[in-house]
Amino acid sequence: MASKKVYELTQSGLDQLKDELTHLKDVKRVENLEALKEAREQGDLSENADYDAARNEQARIEARILEIESILKNVKIIRTNDDSTTVNIGKKVLLHFVEKNKDVEYHVVGTIEADPKNFKISIESPLGRAIKGKEVGDLVQIKSATNKQSNVEIKAIS
């Protein structure tokens, strides 16, 4: 029997998924059913672009609901130890990119919560793996997507 994937999330990430699931079921599903009803009222469904679009949206909504429900059945909440001095899920980390002489603060999260545009990096990303378990003052080398080496110093963990 295959083992199920366990999804590591912070409490915040779990709350966001639950909120998204509620929104999909209580708002998006209802809106989509109304759109389907309106499209059906237009007549011939064989060449009805509105109907096709509504059906595609319905499939997307239902797939996301199933995905979230599966995640919620296999979730492991990662509780951050505030006394911990090492990088792990749930921690905020101030990194100094030596070659660029630039400081950037990231929130280290589970894969599902990752959102690089909002400075949330997955612990399983190349950067996340490189800094996991490290402490303030540690210097790590990371390889960029273009295979360029960079030195990163951990300046703060909170």
UniProtKB/Swiss-Prot annotation:
Record keywords, A-Z: Coiled coil, DNA-binding, Transcription, Transcription regulation
Any one GO MF annotation of this record: DNA binding
Coiled coil: 14-76
InterPro entries: GreA/GreB_C_sf, TF_GreA/GreB_CS, Tscrpt_elong_fac_GreA, Tscrpt_elong_fac_GreA/B, Tscrpt_elong_fac_GreA/B_C, Tscrpt_elong_fac_GreA/B_fam, Tscrpt_elong_fac_GreA/B_N, Tscrpt_elong_fac_GreA/B_N_sf
Domain of life of the native organism: Bacteria
Biological process according to GO: DNA-templated transcription elongation; regulation of DNA-templated transcription elongation
Protein family membership: Belongs to the GreA/GreB family.
Purpose: Necessary for efficient RNA polymerase transcription elongation past template-encoded arresting sites. The arresting sites in DNA have the property of trapping a certain fraction of elongating RNA polymerases that pass through, resulting in locked ternary complexes. Cleavage of the nascent transcript by cleavage factors such as GreA or GreB allows the resumption of elongation from the new 3'terminus. GreA releases sequences of 2 to 3 nucleotides.
Protein name: Transcription elongation factor GreA
Lineage of producing organism: Bacteria, Bacillati, Mycoplasmatota, Mollicutes, Acholeplasmatales
